[in-house]
Amino acid sequence: MIVCIAEKPSVAKDIARIIGATPARDGYMEGNGYQVTWTFGHLCELKEPDDYTPMWKRWSLSALPMIPQRFGIKLINDEGIRKQFNTIERLMQAADSIINCGDAGQEGELIQRWVMQKAQAKCPVKRLWISSMTDEAIKQGFQELKDQNEYQSLYLAGLSRAIGDWILGMNATRLYTLKYGQNRQVLSIGRVQTPTLALIVNRQKEIDNFVSEPYWVLATIYRDTQFTATSGKFTSKEEGEKAFSTIAGKPFTVTDVSKKKGNEAPPHLYDLTSLQVDCNKKFAYSADITLKLIQSLYEKKYTTYPRVDTQFLTDDIYPKCPQILNGVSQAKIMSQQKYLPLIQQLAATGKKLPKSKKVFDNSKVTDHHAIIPTGVPPTGLTDMEANVYDLIAKRFISVFYPDCKFSTTTVLGEVINEDGPKPEKIEFKVSGKEILEPGWRVVYAKDAKNSDDDDATDNANGNDGGNGAKKEVVEERTLPSFVKGESGEHTPTLTEKWTTPPKYYTEATLLRAMETAGKFVEDEELRAALKENGIGRPSSRAGIIETLFKRHYIKRQRKNLMATPTGIELIDTIHEELLKSCELTGIWEKKLRDIEHKTYDPADFINGLKEQINQIVNDVLSDNSARHVAITTEEDLKKKEPSKKTAPKKSPKQDDTAEKTPKNGDTAEKTESRSPKLPADDSIIGKTCPICGQGTIIKGKTAYGCSNWKGGCQFRLPFSQQ
C-alpha cells in the first residue's frame, strides 16, 4: 500500500479524488492501492526545556544558557492531533512506500519530515512537488515524483531555522524577562521579531525627535508653466530674498529645449511580499489577511503556490500561458468578464506572446515561480478574494503587453540681472512626461485615477515624505511648445517650506524594510539583490507582525504602525546589537539559504548561535543597572490618545508658508499663504485651490487637499475643523 500524506484535509481530498482513493475512512481515504491521510499543519514541535531536564522547568538565571546536547521533537499536546497522528503512525508503519505531499516549501518539508520521524517510518519516501493545486498539476506531479533525498538540504535549512529560533528565543526571552520584567510580564525576544520591532521603534524616535527646519524654494511662472531654480533650496531666508530680488522685473529666457524618448517595462510579477505590499496600499489589508486570502485562492485552484520570493517564471511555463490567459478571460468578477477585452486586445495583434527575460528566467527561480493565475476561472469569490485575484490577474496580463513608450521634455531657462558691476544669473528647469504609446498601462487605465487619488489623499493627510528629500518624479503632462532663445515676462515666487519628518511605518513599508534588511530601495533590481539578506521569510513576516501586536509591542493608528511604551523600552533595554540588528539577522537568513543550497554546513550555523547566546547571557548578567521595561495592557491600547497637531514644531515669528511675488513689475510684496476660511464640508470639493490657484480641492481620508499636491501645493484642511 502507498501512503500519501498531505498538509491539510482539503488538499488530501483533492489528491485522493485524482488518484482514485475516494472511500473515506477514519482519518484517511483509501482506494486504488493508495491511502491518503493528512496533518493539520504542524503536528510536532521541538521539545520544551523541561522535556530535557527538570532543572529547566523553573525560570532561573543560573540555568542559562539552556542548550540541549541533542534536540528532539514531540507531539503537540492536543487530543485531535494525537488521534490523527495515531492514524498516520499506523498507516506508515504498514506502508510499502510513502509519498510526501506536503506544502512544497521549507516549512512544508519540515512539517512532514517530523511526522514521519515521530511515526518511525522505515519505507522508501517519494516527494510530490507542485506549484499549483489544479487537477493537471497534481496529475503531472504524480507522474514526476521525486526522491525525498533531493530535498534533504531544504529540510536541514528548516531544521536549522527551528533550532536557531529555539536557542535564541528560549534563552533570550527567559534572560530578559527575569532581568528586566519585574516579575510582572514575559519579555518575548525573537530572531526576527526583535529586529522588526527595532525598525518601528527607531523610526518612531526619528519622528519624535525631528526638528522641522525652514527652507525656501525659488520658482517662476513663465507662459503658465512653473519653472524651479536649479540651485535647489535655500536654507536661509536672506539668501532666498537675494536671489528673488536678482530676478524680479528681469526677463526670462529659454536656454535649452530637449526631448528624450524612453520605455517603461511592465512591473514584475508578484511574489508574496510585493502582493502583501500592494494589498496594504490599495485595500489596507494586513500582511496576515493577505496571506490567508492568497492561500485560500491557492487551495481553490485559482492561483499558484503563494509563499514565494521570486517574481519570475520558468521557461516551461511559457507554453502554458495562452491557456492560462484563456481561462482568465472567462473569469467573472462582480458578474463582469473584465479581463476579456484586455486579453482579446493581446490576441488581436496576431503575434505570439512575447517571452521576455524580465518574466521568464530559470536562474531566478528555485523551488517555485512567481504567483500567477492557474487559468481556472474563479467563482464564488468574496470581495476581498476578488480584490487579490484582480491584482494577480492584471499583473499577469500586463507582462505580455508592450513597454509603455513616453517622451520626456526638459526645458531650461535663465534670468540675468546686469544692473550690478557683475552680471548675476539664475537658472531654472521644468520637465514634463508625455505618454506616446501606453502599452501595458492600458491594463491599469481604470485604476490610474484611483491610484493618483490615493497618493493625493496621503498628501492631504499630511504624509508627504521625510526630511524634505524626495526622489524627483517627472509629472505626466504636456508642456507648451517652447523655443530656445524666446524671452518674456515671468512671475517669480519665493516659497517658504518646512522639512518634514519620516513617515511612520505601514505594513506595506515595513514589509519592504524587512525584505531588504532595513535598507530602503525603490529600484526593483537592487531590491532583488538585497532579498537574500532580508529578515524573515516571505511566509513568516505576516506572522511576525501579528506577534508584535499580540505582545502589545506595537499598535495601529489608521494604517500607521506605532510602538507602545513596552516596545520602546524593550528595544532601549537591549544593548546586544545581535538581537536587534537587521543586518546581522539578514546574514543569518543568508546562511540558512546557503544551507538550503548546500553551500553552508548546518552544524556551523548552530555552533555559531551557541557561541552568540553564551555571549549575550554573559553580557546581560553583568549588567548592574536597575533598568526595567514598562507594561502595556489591553486597556492602555484602548485609551484614546489626545490629538496631536500634524504640523511639526516651528520656531516663533515664522509663518507656515510665505511667498514673495512682484508687484507692478519692479517691487516685491510679502503675502501670507495661509488657508483662507472655507467650509470644512464636501461643498468645497472641486473648487479652485485658494493657495496655488492651479489645482482643485479633493477629499482625503482625514482632510481636504489640493489636486496639485505633486506640484508642491501644501493646502490642507482637516475634517476636524468642521
Regions found by a protein language model. Name each.
Residues M1-W166, M170, A448-K449:
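Intrinsically disordered, low-complexity regulatory segments
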Residues I2-V3, K118, A287-D288, D309-Q722:
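Basic, low-complexity terminal or inter-domain segments flanking catalytic cores
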Residues K237-Y270, Q276:
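Metal- or metallocofactor-binding catalytic centers and their adjacent structured scaffolds
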Residues G72-I98, L199-I200, D278-C279, L391-I397, ...:
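Phosphate-interacting basic helix/loop segments used at nucleotide- and nucleic-acid interfaces
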